[in-house]
Amino acid sequence: MKTTIILILLTHWVYSQNPTSGNNTATLCLGHHAVANGTLVKTITDDQIEVTNATELVQSISIGKICNNSYRVLDGRNCTLIDAMLGDPHCDVFQYENWDLFIERSSASSNCYPYDIPDYASLRSIVASSGTLEFTAEGFTWTGVTQNGRSGACKRGSADSFFSRLNWLTKSGNSYPTLNVTMPNNNNFDKLYIWGIHHPSSNNEQTKLYIQESGRVTVSTKRSQQTIIPNIGSRPWVRGQSGRISIYWTIVKPGDILIINSNGNLVAPRGYFKLRTGKSSVMRSDAPIDTCVSECITPNGSIPNDKPFQNVNKVTYGKCPKYIRQNTLKLATGMRNVPEKQIRGIFGAIAGFIENGWEGMVDGWYGFRYQNSEGTGQAGDLKSTQAAIDQINGKLNRVIERTNEKFHQIEKEFSEVEGRIQDLEKYVEDTKIDLWSYNAELLVALENQHTIDLTDAEMNKLFEKTRRQLRENAEDMGGGCFKIYHKCDNACIGSIRNGTYDHYIYRDEALNNRFQIKGVELKSGYKDWILWISFAISCFLICVVLLGFIMWACQKGNIRCNICI
């Protein structure tokens, strides 16, 4: 019986020795911010990894209207840019206008003599980039012909008229002499001359207007020469006309000379447009124009340019995000998110960063949770938090700087005879978009990987900094926590946080407590052995006592045992 009592007391003494139950130790855990529901981003190593915060990088919608600030936006209304340049009567309001962006509407149409421009896209681009319809008339001398031809297909008011920037020349009497006119460029800028040739609908119309059965127009400079012969024949009727005019253009450099030679069918220039170099453009759009501010315009409307990428439209003007095919790309602006697990008592509540993050941290991304003689508490670490934020801040701006186009992406137009060129251009544009889409995804994945790595590194730096401060005064419990072997009140915890902790002050106390605790602290394996040994001895003693009682009772006659065979 004495042995049993001794073993029971020994077992009770072993389990009563809880090193953390007194006031001479403390527990300190390091952790990081977490949220209940994070955002999934893509990195180089993971297609989906959860972070506490992320920023969308792809602008996918427009504001639905075109802002007239920060650019001069000119609404073409029912006129195309070329009609306004030629002087179509219903476009007279646009003479001498200036613009950064000329908006052509889908409802725009010509309202004069039907024409075509063999190199329409190039002329439209040249005029659009010039940003002005500034026109200067010149004194061309056309001897022996009738000037200012008119047509019922081109009404100015109720009267027959013609394009105001062109001079339709026809016979005078019964003659149309050969014309040979020169015009030098003595200015220091390029001059754009617009001219044309008339294609009559029949031979009868040809001789009626020009006498000769076939005319010819040759326009030359020192650098180029164009000779055009009319194609006589009936065409589909447009505004009462089956004839056509083909419009051509010639640029005369400073010091060069314009020479026009013709014996019929000439639609002559009246002067020149002054070409300017700039970043003006033209865009087809039906979006309304309104008073607002935006640095990026698409046919769908203006879009903000605070994101590096957009998938609203390939055609843009201004300082615009790069067009890509992806609908979404998210840039990590927070750390890896490990939602906090269910609390498992007081020690589970202060589990360290290795196990999970901490929700509800409001004073930093990284911090401390502790338990000491004064209770429990939590505090953020501003220095490590600021170090991480400083490295993440500016990531978005750097991505925008790398990708935003500082120029406009104009529309591409080609005639039917240039179909192969159009196919090639489309292939090149599609390849560029595919390449940029891939580059964008790769760039964001790299940045996300860097963000997660650097935030993890800041957590590790804080842990190592704390370990170096505590030295032998504490023991790494694993999971991001330390057991401090001396009394550490809130002021002591504060000194660890701000880096002023002096381990020499607590060294003797910590060593003494460590030795005392270690002297009586039994490992879980030894405790198990003692339990099994005490259990076995107790069972043996109980059996001995029970057997002795039975034998004693048998001797006294109180118990009789019959054995039958």
Swiss-Prot record:
One term of GO molecular function: host cell surface receptor binding
Transmembrane segment boundaries: 530-550
Residues carrying covalently attached carbohydrate according to the record: N23, N37, N53, N68, N78, N180, N300, N498
Membrane topology reported for the UniProt record: Single-pass type I membrane protein
Cited InterPro entries: Capsid_hemagglutn, Hemagglutn_HA1_a/b_dom_sf, Hemagglutn_influenz_A, Hemagglutn_influenz_A/B
Coiled coil feature spans: none
GO annotation, biological process: clathrin-dependent endocytosis of virus by host cell; fusion of virus membrane with host endosome membrane; fusion of virus membrane with host plasma membrane; viral budding from plasma membrane; virion attachment to host cell
Positions of the record's site feature: Cleavage: R344, G345
Cleavable signal peptide: 1-16
Residues linked to a lipid group, S-palmitoyl cysteine type: C554, C561, C564
Extracellular side: 17-529
SUPFAM superfamilies named among the record's database cross-references: Influenza hemagglutinin (stalk) (SSF58064), Viral protein domain (SSF49818)
Segments on the Cytoplasmic face: 551-565
GO CC terms of this entry: host cell plasma membrane; membrane; viral envelope; virion membrane
Pfam families cross-referenced by the UniProt entry: Hemagglutinin
Compartments reported by the entry: Virion membrane; Host apical cell membrane
Source species, domain of life: Viruses
PTM description: Palmitoylated. In natural infection, inactive HA is matured into HA1 and HA2 outside the cell by one or more trypsin-like, arginine-specific endoprotease secreted by the bronchial epithelial cells. One identified protease that may be involved in this process is secreted in lungs by club cells.
Disulfide feature: C29-C481, C67-C292, C79-C91, C112-C154, C296-C320, C488-C492
Miscellaneous remark of the record: Major glycoprotein, comprises over 80% of the envelope proteins present in virus particle. The extent of infection into host organism is determined by HA. Influenza viruses bud from the apical surface of polarized epithelial cells (e.g. bronchial epithelial cells) into lumen of lungs and are therefore usually pneumotropic. The reason is that HA is cleaved by tryptase clara which is restricted to lungs. However, HAs of H5 and H7 pantropic avian viruses subtypes can be cleaved by furin and subtilisin-type enzymes, allowing the virus to grow in other organs than lungs.
Record note on quaternary structure: Homotrimer of disulfide-linked HA1-HA2.
Function: Binds to sialic acid-containing receptors on the cell surface, bringing about the attachment of the virus particle to the cell. This attachment induces virion internalization of about two third of the virus particles through clathrin-dependent endocytosis and about one third through a clathrin- and caveolin-independent pathway. Plays a major role in the determination of host range restriction and virulence. Class I viral fusion protein. Binds to sialic acid-containing receptors on the cell surface, bringing about the attachment of the virus particle to the cell. This attachment induces virion internalization either through clathrin-dependent endocytosis or through clathrin- and caveolin-independent pathway. Plays a major role in the determination of host range restriction and virulence. Class I viral fusion protein. Responsible for penetration of the virus into the cell cytoplasm by mediating the fusion of the membrane of the endocytosed virus particle with the endosomal membrane.
Family listed: Belongs to the influenza viruses hemagglutinin family.
Protein name: Hemagglutinin
Organism: Influenza A virus (strain A/Equine/Kentucky/2/1986 H3N8)
